[in-house]
Amino acid sequence: MSSRRRSSSRRSGEPSTVIYIPSSNEDTPADEEAEDSVFTSTRARSATEDLDRMEAGLSPYSVSSDAPSSFELVRETGGTGAAKKPSEKKRSSSRRQPQIAAGAPRGSPATPKAGKSPKVSRPPSVPSLPENGAGGGGDDNSSSGGSSSRTTSNSSRSTSPVAPGEPSAAEGDEFSFCDSDIEDFERECYRVSVADNLGFEPSVVAPQHVEYLKFVLQDFDVQHLRRLNECIPMPAFALTSLVDPVLNNVAPGERDLTRRIITHAVIINYYYVAQKKARHMVEAIRTTVRGDTVRRVAAQVNNQSRSGRAAALALHFLTSRKGVTDGQYATSLRRLDEELRHRGTPESPRLTEVYQTLRDYNVLFYTAHYTSRGALYLYRQNLQRLNENHRGMLRLLSVEEICEEHTLNDLAFLVGVELMITHFQRTIRVLRCYLQHQLQSISELCYLIYVQLPSLREDYAQLSDVIYWAVSQNYDYALYASTPALFDFLRVVRQQDAFICTDYVYCALRLLACPDRPIIGDTGGSSSSQRLVGEFMVRDPLLRDPRATHLRQKLITRDICVARLQAQPSSRHIPVEHTGVSSVTLLKIFSQVPPDEREEDTLREMALKAFMEANGNHPEQICRSPPPPLPPRDYPQRDERDRHRRDRRDSGEYCC
């Protein structure tokens, strides 16, 4: 049985992204056919690849084959007309095929029939390319009148040729993701990656560096770093005091450098996360202040009473477009706190309870005497949401009921949040200065390592350039580039087969720089001077660099200033003398290793290592796994820094 085919003219402006439903054997009126056979879409739908449809089982092996393809009834995503009879919904798929080739251009606005809302089907999210075989077949069938559908068995259904760029029939059954679903999926993947990375941002501290931290830290200290990386707002000095890594599986000479690099990694990660969190806090408080709740509260504030004037002052500071100082916020919060204290009841939480409830979420937050525990727990949830990078409106008591007590509680909380954000932003600036100070200290420590191991010349020169850019530039990109450079230098130091004693070398430099005072209580004459003691310290064969051959004359010099007490301290002043270590002294520190002594020194070093591992206060424990290899050096802007280093070398700043 074959149904009678009708042809109708296409409405002007109708988009080409329409889906036609196969018709049943029953004939229907033309009006119902015009209304129910077309499902318009608000945006263009792109056809799916032939290979994707074949892999999904939605089309036969060849699109242009004689075997017809089929598709099920189109399921509307948001409409209400999905409960109609199948006989009313199924229409011929090739009935309007001649009009498709000569229709309006793709992407033209839809013009649904007056009084009828368009039925929208969500387009698939899979990109597509122009179809090769099906496109030509669609044009041929369209020119022949659109009656080329075949039936091979009772289970086969009618199909329409697919025009280039037109949605195929099988796309009606494909599952598609909306934009919000994709954003949620990406956010969840990012959260999982950060959680596996101990809370470190992958763009700040690479995952391979985090694996090294897991290897050198104790298990309880790994969890401690994870809690610190949650970036709970706190003072800068509190953060620097909490970062105290407990090392494991680290050589004694490498602990000082490893501890400083880990501390730097934790603080710079906190700095990065805190910047993003502060921006989200500002957005959340601005959204809340400009919301309908605060507007309704401002409309009912009475300036005739004392509490009304305190509320009006707080609203003025919250909605002001000019800059508000910390003193102004503190004055407003103090006046609101006085009004809340007068309205307190025996059931109201004490200030000690308020601080104990909120201290785990924000240490910088300024609290007040809230009148109810419901308000306290509500504001605790808001602080927790702010820690989770919430950018929407904050929940207030005035949403349910606007009264004087709720207004004072909400305004005290909002003013406290504004004051907290101001101090949090100031803490972020303090952390940046502290990071630069820390890099200066690490640079001096790395130079002491280089003086003992001159074979690290190129590595130290590269690190010095990175640190110089980090402490001299105002943008954070140069500051973030210092973290991989420090881990690269640590990787090179770990590969050295030598004892690293930075404080011992610094003591020798102090003795060499200040040789004018003989040792007290020694009558040995000039042979007991501090210079000779310093030379004896640095010429120990066990401190020699086993890889250094002729690099001593190419030692990079650095200005080192040694401080010592100059005279008898008084009750008002302690005189201190600063003496610099000359370049000649640095060039003559270590003697070269004679070839006949290298084998003997190697055996002595092995015996000393075994002794230190057996008698150290941090013995080497059983390794959980071999230490992960750190990646090779890959610095950003390397060409620019190399060019800058060559210019400095040519100008004489490097002593080669």
From Swiss-Prot:
* Pfam families linked: Herpes_pp85 (PF04637)
Q: Where are the transmembrane segments?
A: none
* Composition bias, Low complexity: 59-70, 140-160
Annotated spans, Disordered = 1-174, 615-656
The protein's matches in SUPFAM superfamilies, at most eight in alphabetical order, are given as: EF-hand (SSF47473)
Checking InterPro entries in the record gives: EF-hand-dom_pair, Herpes_pp85
Q: Known post-translational modifications? A: Phosphorylated.
Biased composition range(s): Basic and acidic residues? 46-55, 635-656
Which GO terms of the cellular component aspect does the record hold? host cell cytoplasm; viral tegument
Note the subunit structure. Interacts with UL26.
The role this protein plays is: Plays a role viral replication by forming a complex with UL26, thereby contributing to increase its stability. Mechanistically, prevents the proteasomal degradation of UL26 by inhibiting its ISGylation.
Other information:
Major target antigen for the anti-CMV antibody response.
What is the protein named? Phosphoprotein 85
Q: Which organism is it from?
A: Human cytomegalovirus (strain Merlin)
